[in-house]
């Protein structure tokens, strides 16, 4: 799957951007933390669109400035409305609460548990530990680390291969671009690409260019 982040500041723009993005990608990621304001009704609208709902905490590189309790309640509402995916941080102390809620109500939402390192790619043993912890909590493990070298890129690709079908792994930065291009072949369930001029992370590839490259590889 190709996932395109939606990074607009108001809800109507976000929904319009999502509709346009889905002409090129398979799903979108609504970065709810970047919106100026969001209601439960908005979450319901987003949940009807093939998407990942992410309300990234400020302490994990996001923009969510309101209470953690409000964030958790919005994510629960997404689960209640059977959003395709939600993303919650490994460091979020209440992540198991969301899984328990999903299971109790019989929601179809898949839960992605994520980890970010914006400075480096840790050693492979540390990354394995992260992925194992994530998979004990949610359905899909995700990590995004900053790749500084070919060695970092190889580490990330190796882990995609090891956890094929239950991982999303990303090497941020120029050195990590190969992880975005080869990710699907190595076992990542999706790769992120951006609409022109709307990248949400360093090294994100334009979706039209990515599709051209993937067609050449095939």
UniProtKB/Swiss-Prot annotation:
Q: Is the Acetylation keyword given for this protein? A: no
Q: What is its EC number?
A: 4.2.1.10
Q: Which UniProt keywords apply?
A: Amino-acid biosynthesis, Aromatic amino acid biosynthesis, Lyase, Schiff base
Q: Name one GO molecular function term.
A: 3-dehydroquinate dehydratase activity
According to its UniProt entry, one GO biological process term is: amino acid biosynthetic process
InterPro entries (alphabetical): 3-dehydroquinate_DH_AS, Aldolase_TIM, DHquinase_I, Type-I_3-dehydroquinase
Q: Which residues bind 3-dehydroquinate?
A: 29-31, 56, 180, 200, 204
Which top-level group of life is the source organism from?
Answer: Archaea
Specify whether Ion transport is a keyword of the entry.
Answer: no
Subunit structure, briefly?
A: Homodimer.
Task: Please report the name of this protein according to its UniProt entry.
Answer: 3-dehydroquinate dehydratase
The gene behind this protein is aroD
